[in-house]
Amino acid sequence: MNKNNSLLIILGFLYCFTGFAQIDASHKSTYEKVDNLLYLIDKMYVDNVDKSKLECDLVLGMSNQLTPYSAYQQSEKIAHLSIKEQVAYESIGISFKFKGDTVLVENVIPNSGAQKSGIVAGDKIIKIGDNDISDMYYYSDVVEHLIGKKNTIINIELIRDADTIISSVIRKNIPHYNLVVLANPKLKQSINDYENAIKYFDAIYPDSVENSLITEHGIRYMLEQLDPHSTYISLEDIHDMTAPLKGSFTGVGVRFQIVKDTIIVVQAIPGGPSEKVGIMAGDKIVIIDKENVGGIGIKNSDVRDKLLGEKGSKVIVNIKRTSIKELLEFTIERDKIPIYSVDVSYMVAPEIGYIKLNNFSANSVDEIKKAVYKLKSEGMKNLILDLQNNGGGYLMTAVDLSDEFLSGAKQVVSTKGRTFPEKAYETKFKGLLENGNIVILVNESSASASEIVSGAIQDWDRGLIVGRRTFGKGLVQKPINLPDGTQVRITTSKYYTPSGRCIQKPYEGGSIAYRKEKYDRYISGESFHADSIKFNLDETFETKLKNRIVYGGGGIMPDYFVPLDTTGTSKYYNSLIRKGIMNQFALVWVNKNRKKLESKYSSFNKFKSNFNTDKVIKELISYAEKEGLEYNEESYKKAEKTINIRLKANIAQDLYDYSRFYEIINELNSTLQKSIELIQDGEAFKKLAKI
């Protein structure tokens, strides 16, 4: 019996269903989109692919849009039960994905308990019952807590904009067939054909099915099964995904924050349209193009949509400024706004410069050069480049940045794929940083382009890598625009460091295990002890000049290990940060005291040397209590130093500019502090670098 026939028998048994509708012409574009994508994967993907499995994965992903009981959200709580027994269990009726330490609600099923309790798409769940989302690492962990006996109630704590809400949600009204059909492994294996699945969903699902939407979910799931980095980008997400790497976007040029449903300008970007017309930090935006934007429910995305637009177009904003009764009206002409990848650059010690790079964009090397010229004019002879939490970006930017450090013609990286020949990238020009000691700071979130630069510096014995083992992303994606304007990024090759290492960590366990691997390092002790790292002895290599032993197959191992420091944190501190209370308070407090602060601390250096948070802390604690965070003396004392420094950094950011935050907070950056010590202790540096 073939799979299509078995599908018909199962459907007929469960639903007395006797046939599929004819293919509607409206489905044609989605069919073509899927066909094009399957063809591209077959021709370009880094490894051989099973086309039939691809299409099966596509269908499984489509089913997730219609129900929370998808292939990768299947609950072990009910998997062993018979179909009849499974019917007694229901969920609250949402589909979701992880977003940081929260669960982002993507869709709410009509008439479900979630909908009736007021949960909406975009809500961020932080707690289910007594269980924090931050303690969950698998989709199945979340599902285990969402699923329960029919008509039972669960408390859901969530964040909507800046507000924390607790909803009592009943497990009820998830349609019977969602659980039976999509939790049935036999049936899931039977629906393995895209065209068949579209007909199937049209035929049995009681609500109208938007095929383009469920197809997008299917494509995402299918690509996720290939590897963790092949991905699909919708029209809505393309701008947010590409703007940081392009290095600019078109808008009015303000950083803002929403506090108590009020849009407050944190900074008018220097040289941008808003600064030119006179908008200032602390201004409150109340009207945009004659529409009142103050009030309950305003979101960051709503504000961005109103302020972004075509270059040369105009937007009228009305501002409430402290000490001025009347609203101020400004007409702003939208223009290109730079997105900087250098967060900060300054001298951290005599002769030692520091640059923090947040990604590898089209403009990153120019930004680095500008910073280097400035630092050299201030006496820099050695550089610390901070790539901690830098997730990467353009490969060629990584190559060009490495060229600034390496002399002569040296290979930086090579790439090789199944259908793409090996290609080597070498240094070509005389760089600004070919002399002096170099330290690269890395951690478990330094990935991709960050690892290319770190690998090249390490393999050519040019400097020291300090911190913790990097993420381990050695796959290269090619962005491909689809006819409908959406985009896919398909892994086409792997990259290799100059010594021949591929530092890609294993991903055969699936995307969830892949993402969780960073947490596994924490649990195993690797984040705290270098000797807890398990090297793959089959992936042993030597550096090019000093013949030091280095390893492949799982990130770049630093030359000097700095453990993760958790001694200065506590539950109270984490709540101040996670709930946004610290940021909100600092902005409100600075706005209230701005004139006095600007008069007393006319320069940042005065502020850094003389400002004390002792009196402000009491106001922060009071503000936090009003926001629902109960004060805990023991928890506060445990993180007292961290809380004070973080508050001072937030105030500096709001009073001066974004970069000043790092000049304060870096006092807590143990990896940076150790790197300064290594450079200043010349013998220790030479011993590690084998100079």
Feature map (PLM): residue ranges:
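Flexible, acidic/glycine-enriched loop-and-adjacent beta/alpha segments
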Residues: 464-496, 510-523, 528, 532-535, ...
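Metal-dependent DNA phosphodiester-chemistry modules and their immediately adjacent helices/loops
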Residues: 448, 496-502
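Translation machinery proteins
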Residues: 70-99, 228-259, 421
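Cleft-lining beta-strand/loop regions that shape enzyme active-site pockets
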Residues: 21-30, 34, 38-51, 74, ...
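Conserved functional hotspot residues or short segments at active or partner-binding sites
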Residues: 502-503, 507-691
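Generic structural signal for buried aliphatic residues
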Residues: 125, 154, 285-286, 315, ...
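Amphipathic alpha-helical segments that form the core helices of the histone-fold
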Residues: 56-67, 217-227, 606-624, 646
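Bacterial Sec-dependent N-terminal signal peptides
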Residues: 1-27, 37
